[in-house]
């Protein structure tokens, strides 16, 4: 029997908007070995403790402003320090592409097809998206838009359906 290991815990700031909750759900589908924790009234310390108790390596926080996801902060749970910090300057969710979450569920084999963004390489590997085989349910392409600004595009390989786009600034 295969035991699922939690590698990444995903959460948000308190009282997230529907858009932020949807983004967290999509991240949970596309980041292998990840689990979402609802923040609720939990303190940051309680979230860290829960992630450590789950045996996770990373804690990914999505911070929002005016209901829109604005920043992604990834903590290394071994050193308890920030490992990655990105400003989210653009976001298209599955609903923006008329794709339902049910179409995305169960597609856990994520492969990097193209990576033009050096500053995202380690992040993608740490988020368990390093498979370079042809057995991919989802492919990720990263395209350099400007120095330290990159577009990440996620597509279902079965029908070449785009379902998630993020513009990340380092």
UniProtKB/Swiss-Prot annotation:
Domain of life, per lineage: Archaea
Segments forming domain Brix: 6-170
Single GO BP term: rRNA processing
Gene3D superfamilies per UniProt: Probable brix-domain ribosomal biogenesis protein (3.40.50.10480)
An annotated Gene Ontology molecular function: rRNA binding
Family annotation (InterPro entries): Brix, Brix_dom_Rbsml_bgen_prot
Extent of the signal sequence: none
PROSITE patterns xrefs: BRIX
Entry keyword annotation includes Nucleotide-binding: no
Described purpose of this protein according to its UniProt entry: Probably involved in the biogenesis of the ribosome.
Name by which UniProt lists this protein: Probable Brix domain-containing ribosomal biogenesis protein
The species this protein was found in: Saccharolobus solfataricus (strain ATCC 35092 / DSM 1617 / JCM 11322 / P2)
Lineage, top ranks: Archaea, Thermoproteota, Thermoprotei, Sulfolobales, Sulfolobaceae
């Amino acid at each position: 029997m295969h035991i699922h290991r939690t590698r990444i815990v995903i959460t948000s700031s308190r009282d997230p908007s529907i858009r932020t909750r949807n983004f967290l759900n999509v991240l949970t589908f596309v980041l292998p070995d990840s689990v979402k924790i609802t923040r609720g009234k939990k303190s940051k310390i309680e979230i860290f403790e829960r992630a450590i108790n789950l045996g996770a390596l990373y804690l990914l926080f999505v911070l929002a402003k005016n209901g829109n996801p604005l920043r992604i902060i990834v903590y290394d749970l071994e050193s308890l320090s920030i490992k990655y910090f990105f400003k989210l300057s653009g976001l298209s969710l599955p609903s923006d592409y008329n794709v339902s979450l049910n179409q995305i569920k169960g597609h856990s084999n994520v492969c990097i097809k193209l990576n033009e963004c050096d500053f995202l390489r380690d992040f993608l590997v740490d988020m368990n998206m390093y498979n370079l085989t042809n057995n991919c349910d989802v492919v990720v392409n990263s395209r350099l838009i400007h120095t330290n600004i990159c577009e990440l595009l996620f597509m279902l390989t079965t029908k070449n359906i785009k379902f998630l786009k993020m513009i990340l600034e380092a």
